[in-house]
Amino acid sequence: ESFERPVTAMGEVNSPLLPSKRKWKQHGQGGLWISDWLPNHARIADELCVLRSCVSDGINHAGGVCQMNTGSVFGGRPSLGAWATYGLGTENQSLPGFVVLKDSKSAIVNGVRCWGSGFMPAGYQGVLLEPGDEPIANLNRPRGVSRAQHERKLTLLNKLNRQHARGRESNTELEARIRSYELAYRMQAEAPEAVDLSAETESTRRLYGLDNETTQVYGRQCLMARRLVERGVRFVQLYHGAGSKWDSHSGMEKNHSRLCAQVDIPIVGLLTDLKQRGLLEDTLVIWGGEFGRTPMSEKGDGRDHNPTGFTMYLAGGGVKGGQTIGATDDLGLYAVQDKLHVHDIHATILALMGLDHTQ
C-alpha cells in the first residue's frame, strides 16, 4: 500500500472488501501514485522506477531473505554484493568492497548468509559495520602503542600467517582471514574518517533527518552509505527493521506507520544528496524486502506474507525514473502483468552494473 492503490468495494452489497486507510496522490511528471505512508517520496517521484509485480519463492523469512540476497531459498550461494565485488572489484584498497549496515543490535534473518560469499573465496563476503558511534570495533591503535610498534606487530603477524598458509592454498577462509588483517591495517588510515559524520554540515544532517529522533538512526545509515560510496566502496547494503520489525502479522497500521516514518526522510535525503553531488547517475539504489503483505487481514489488524505480488523500486544507475512496471490483480495479491521473479530482478541489477548474469 505504498505505491499501488488497492481496489475498493464501498457500496457493494455484503462486500467483504474494505477501502485502504491510505490517502493517495499522483506526483511528478510521470504521475506516480504514492501513499501518505511515504509523503516525502513525492519530492523524488521522477527518480523512481517502481516494480509492482515482484515475485519470489520464499514463503517464510529464512527462504525469502536468502533468495532476495543470493537468488536461492537455500543457503550456500554467493550474495548479490559478493558477485558485484567479484565482477567489478573495489575502487579503494583501503576500504572493503562490500559493506553492510544495520540499524540495531537485533539479529538479521540468516545473518552472514545474507552477505556471504557462498562457494566463492571468502574474501568477497561483506563486512558488517555495527550501529552506533563505533561501527568498526577495535580498529584504532591501542593506547600506549606507537605506530612503529604496531607496524612491527602486524609485520610479524603477517609473516606467521603466510608461513601457516603454505600448503593450505585451497583454504579460502584462511586466505580471507589473512587479507582481512591486511585490510584492517589499511583501514586504520582511512576508515575512521569515512564513518565520521561530524564533518558533515548541519544542512546535510537535516537533509537525512539526523535532527529528528524518529529518523536519526536510519538517517545515519543512509549518510554513511553516501560517504562510503563517495570513497569507492562498490556495494553498500542497508538493513532497516533488523529483528523482523516489518513482519506485521498484527498491528500493521500502527507498526508500518511508525516504520515508514523512520525511513521516508532518510531515503529521500540519500537520493537527493547523491543527485546534488553528481553521484546518482553512477549509483544504483534498490529499495525493497523479501516479500510483501497479503491484502487479506490476519489476526484482525495484521497481514500475512505475500511472495506472489509485491513492490520494490530502483533509482539512479541508468534507470529511467518516473515510471511503474508491472501490476498485480485488483486485490493486490498476485502479480498479473510483467511478472518479475527475483532472478529477473537480480539479472537486471547485474546488467545495470555491466555484468552478465549468465557468465
Q: Model-flagged regions — what are they?
A:
Residues 1-359:
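Ligand-binding pockets and gating/stacking loops
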